[in-house]
Amino acid sequence: MAEVEAPATAVEAPAAAVATTTPEVAAPEAGAATEAKGPHKLHRQWTFWYDIQTKTKSGAAWGTSLKKAYTFDTVEEFWSMYDQIFRPSKLSGNADFHLFKAGVEPKWEDPECANGGKWTVPCNRKATFETMWLETLMALIGEQFDETEDICGIVASVRARGDKLALWTRTASNEAVQVNIGKKWKDVIDYNDKITYTFHDDSKRDKPSRGGRYTV
């Protein structure tokens, strides 16, 4: 189900070999027998995106550097793309990786995102950042969130001032749902500090509010 280009200008060259022993979302045990010979289908399709920014986003220019990279619906495709390309450590500065449900664009204007918001986790340690990114990816494609239908996707942002992850959701006004998602996400990535939820509508303002709407 390959499509479009890979972010070759922003990442290291992919490894020559692709991991093939990935019959489950989580890394399988060594030597584990695999009964099914075919690919392991996911519950839904997901799409990787990337955004390599050459200058600060502003106004109508926002989103012009956003590119769709690959849509997949099997465990094997996920691990192949992750291992070769979609590790944050392969990104140059001022760039983003996204994993969103197929058909949903990582933009405020997308109908699935327009009334939503995001939980944000800052991270200044590269190893921890990459681990949290991978754990979130596996939780999403493995449908581990009870409120999975309210989740749009995840963004990994690499910046000189500090990296961060942002989990985008659909219905920002539903506090109970967002709080449950935030708590579950913290469990998934083993994060103990407070995190905040911001409405996309707040972020769109000329002078965005510095505080989040919800905190867990």
Swiss-Prot record:
Gene Ontology terms: cellular component: eukaryotic translation initiation factor 4F complex
Disulfide bond positions: C113-C152
Family in the record: Belongs to the eukaryotic initiation factor 4E family.
Descriptive protein name: Eukaryotic translation initiation factor isoform 4E-2
Pfam families: IF4E
The record's account of how the chain is modified after translation: According to the redox status, the Cys-113-Cys-152 disulfide bridge may have a role in regulating protein function by affecting its ability to bind capped mRNA.
Keyword Oxidoreductase: no
Residue span of region Disordered: 1-23
Biological role stated in the UniProt entry: Recognizes and binds the 7-methylguanosine-containing mRNA cap during an early step in the initiation of protein synthesis and facilitates ribosome binding by inducing the unwinding of the mRNAs secondary structures.
InterPro entries: TIF_eIF4e-like (IPR023398), TIF_eIF_4E (IPR001040), TIF_eIF_4E_CS (IPR019770)
Organism annotation: Zea mays (Maize)
Domain of life: Eukaryota
